[in-house]
Amino acid sequence: MSPPKYHRLDPGQRREQILDAANTLFGERPYEDVSIEDIANAAGVTRGLVHHYFGGRKEVYIGLLERLGAQREQELRPPKGRSARARVADSVSRWLDWTDANRMIWLATISHGEDIADPEVRHVVGDLVRRAVALLASFHADVAEDSARLRYALECWTGLNRTATRRWLDGDTTREATHDLLASTLEHILRTFGAAPAPRPRTVPE
């Protein structure tokens, strides 16, 4: 087979081209069934060029995870100048819009990334969760005090988010039910776990 023909692009464009091809492949097949040669052929480049920009299949997958994570963070960013309840409802709605539009790759990567045995991939997935938690805390800092307690609750919410969104995309429930669950629980977490702890009563010496 003759090597694929490709046009000269700047490094950023070439990386995006390779990630776009990987996005399609990993959305259609399990991680283990996609090879560097598959990615190169889908992108219309040589294997050597994929190795040059990423190293190997794992690095391509990690690059894709990080790009999807950045897109997810953007969708969770609430609009300014609205009530806490309206911001939560809007960000959850935009999140569901994004996952619906990108369902195949989301189900294949972020939703199941923790199931991949490679420790580096699992670490990246865990880091994406921690980043999402930190951003959620910062997005709602005007109504919720950032603390270890709040971040613990938000990390649990991201697990609920993955499960609920997966069930909806699999057709087991409705979008409305998923939105209600995610928005109401996030609002409750911000209100309950983001509240400043009550001061302990002072002990009066006898």
Report the location of each language-model feature.
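Amphipathic alpha-helical segments used for helix-helix packing
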Residues: T99-R122, V133-A137, R162-L169
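Amphipathic alpha-helical packing segments from all-alpha helical-bundle domains
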Residues: E73, A117-V143, A148-C156, A177-R191
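Alpha-helical DNA-contacting segments of helix-turn-helix folds
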Residues: Y61-L68, T109, V124
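Hydrophobic alpha-helical connector segments
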Residues: G63, R77-M104, E145-S147, H179
